[in-house]
UniProtKB/Swiss-Prot annotation:
Its EC number is 6.2.1.5. It comes from Christiangramia forsetii (strain DSM 17595 / CGMCC 1.15422 / KT0803) (Gramella forsetii). GO terms for cellular component: cytosol; succinate-CoA ligase complex. This is Succinate--CoA ligase [ADP-forming] subunit beta. GO terms for molecular function: ATP binding; magnesium ion binding; succinate-CoA ligase (ADP-forming) activity; succinate-CoA ligase (GDP-forming) activity. HAMAP family: Succ_CoA_beta. Pathway: Carbohydrate metabolism; tricarboxylic acid cycle; succinate from succinyl-CoA (ligase route): step 1/1.
Length: 398
């Protein structure tokens, strides 16, 4: 589950990670009030107005701007709130901004020049261990750094038996070229950051940039946090941070009815039971010359009602030109799935106007085939995997 920057910073702050202070505002008036309060605390009249959407690259899209007085705060907040922000990580339509984060300006003058770093904590799936990835090239797209100057990216893997050890945090600070107060501050920052990552059951922390201020304080200026959905039962307060306005509407609807659905950009809808079979089915669609329009796992308890709900979700996508139903009946009874297909056709009528290829194998597959054959539906049946692929290819070539 993705959350907003300000929510991620709240989590970081609760574990002792120093953050760039700020207040959320939902209109220009609230933004001005937030700026006034920050001025009282910091003594500076400069503020940064940051659009709160679930997407990176906000600055490139005009979603992060500096305001040097209250008038500019009001103007910029009014301009950003309500806009459709287009970034390299959004669709062409962009995402509507409902709120902004009004923050303090932390690039103040002092004895030293401020310096930016990149740091993230994530699971290295190749080794099965958490890993801290960091670089001196903060404030930039880490993908660009990895491609052009990979030698500037460092990694530190953490043994799950011991957790992050002090010498590892010190090594990170050393590799970033820090010394004196900055070295001690970075060591403390890294230890607190990793504690926050573990105890919040997150799958990703990305801080870009981590800032060393002119007086050698280390703080998180930005925060991209992804929480593990499967652990939200342990964090009721985090679960309340979900902003469904930022999520795909069909995915939200699927979650509410207990289906695992991920929206994709292709033209062939797929309905499968089991994540492994779903992945194989998506490969099958690719080999047949199509592109998967979705990942949809109806689960091990698929019945007629769930199958009908699945069809409704798939057909919400106007790009879908065909649907492949690929079910292996172990616990799932194929006849129930077949009944769901028949019921969906009756209840949805003309909405089910795309070709449907059905492969039902396993428990009660013979009964399922009889149900579909006697239904009068224009459904293509397949027994073998390759046969299903051929029928998808045939449909797409028409």
């Amino acid at each position: 589950m993705n959350i907003h920057e300000y929510q991620g910073k709240e989590i970081l702050n609760s574990f002792g990670v120093r953050i760039q202070r700020g207040t959320v505002a939902r209109n220009a008036k609230e933004a001005v009030e937030a700026a006034k309060e920050l001025t009282e605390k910091t003594g500076t009249g400069w503020h940064v107005i940051k659009a709160q959407v679930h997407a990176g690259g906000r600055g490139k899209g005009g979603g992060v701007k500096l305001a040097k007085n209250l008038k500019e705060v009001e103007e910029i907040a009014g301009e950003i709130i309500g806009m459709n922000l287009v970034t390299p990580q959004t669709s062409a339509e962009g995402k509507k901004v409902h709120q902004v984060l009004v923050t303090e300006d932390v690039y103040y003058p002092g004895d030293n020049e401020p310096e930016e770093y990149y740091m993230s904590v994530l699971l290295n799936r190749a080794t099965g261990r958490n890993m801290i990835m960091y670089s001196t090239e903060g404030g930039m797209d880490i993908e660009t750094v990895a491609e052009e100057t990979p030698e500037l990216i460092f990694t530190e893997e953490i043994d799950p038996a011991t957790g992050l050890l002090g010498f590892q945090a010190r090594r990170i600070a050393f590799n970033l070229g820090l010394s004196g107060k900055g070295f001690k501050e970075m060591t403390k920052f890294v230890m607190s950051l990793y504690e926050a990552f573990e105890k919040s059951d997150s799958s990703l922390f990305e801080i870009n940039p981590v800032l060393k201020t002119s007086d050698d304080l280390i703080m998180a200026v930005d925060a991209k946090v992804t929480l593990d959905d499967n652990a939200l039962f342990r964090h009721k307060d985090y679960a309340e941070m979900r902003d469904v306005r930022e999520e795909n509407a069909t995915e939200v609807e699927a979650r509410e009815v207990g289906l695992n659905y991920v929206d994709l950009d292709g033209n062939v809808g797929c309905m499968v039971n089991g994540a492994g079979l779903a992945m194989a089915t998506m490969d099958l669609i690719k080999q047949a010359g199509g592109e998967p329009a979705n990942f949809l796992d109806v689960g091990g308890t698929a019945d007629a009602k769930r199958v009908e709900e699945a069809f409704r979700l798939i057909l919400k996508d106007d790009k879908v030109e065909a649907i492949l139903v690929n079910i292996f009946g172990g616990i799932v009874r194929c006849d129930r799935v077949a009944q769901g297909i028949v019921d969906a056709s009756k209840n949805m009528g003309d909405a089910m106007n795309v070709p449907i290829i059905v492969r039902l194998q396993g428990t009660n597959a013979d009964i399922a085939k009889e149900l579909i054959d006697n239904s009068g539906l224009k459904v293509s049946s397949a027994i073998q995997f390759q046969e299903a692929a051929d029928k998808v290819q045939e449909v797409l070539s028409k």
